[in-house]
Regions:
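Conserved catalytic-core motifs of GNAT/GCN5-like acyltransferases
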Residues: 10, 30-36, 95-98, 122-124
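Core segments of cupin and vicinal oxygen chelate
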Residues: 12-51
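Exposed loop/turn and edge beta-strand positions of beta-sandwich/beta-sheet ligand-binding modules
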Residues: 5, 38, 67, 101
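N-terminal beta-strand motif that seeds the catalytic metal site of vicinal oxygen chelate
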Residues: 1-17, 48, 68-71, 121-125
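Conserved beta-strand in the GNAT
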Residues: 52-55, 116-118
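Mid-chain, well-packed structural core segment of small domains
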Residues: 64, 68-85
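Vicinal oxygen chelate
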Residues: 2, 87-125
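Structural preference for long, well-ordered alpha-helical segments within the folded cores
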Residues: 21-22, 84, 111
Length: 125
């Protein structure tokens, strides 16, 4: 039984609203239907798929990063994304892949999770 696709990532947070706003503003993810769990949270959607689950109600001391280094999203609008990051005062690292030329932008969300956004090689800064 091979895996056929990545289904979702889950972010643990002590501030659900700030996390929803962050991913909505920078990645265009939108809250959508979520089962009636007994804990606070949200499911954030891209193209009608719940790709990011936000789980709240845990004090910061209980949050953990585990062994996952980062989550990556295929995106478009490199220049606009960099402008948003700069306007928010968020540090980022913008790199170009050798040979392929694809752009990678790394930054951290309000919970400390590392996010990568990937852009086509023909985009400009």
């Amino acid at each position: 039984m091979p895996a056929t696709a990545m289904n979702h990532f889950t972010i643990l947070t002590d501030d659900v609203d700030a996390t929803i706003a962050f991913y909505g503003d920078l990645l265009g993810l939108a809250p959508g239907p979520r089962p009636p769990f007994t804990f606070p949270g949200a499911w954030l959607y891209a193209q009608n798929r719940p790709i990011l689950h936000v789980v709240g109600g845990r004090p910061r001391a209980e949050l953990r990063t585990g062994v996952i280094d980062h989550m990556a999203f295929t995106s478009n609008g490199l220049a606009a994304t960099l402008a948003k990051l700069e306007a928010r005062g968020l540090p980022y690292d913008c790199r170009r892949l050798p040979d392929a030329g694809q752009w990678q932008v790394f930054f951290h969300d309000p919970n400390g999770a590392r996010v990568e956004m990937d852009f086509a090689a023909d985009e400009t800064r």
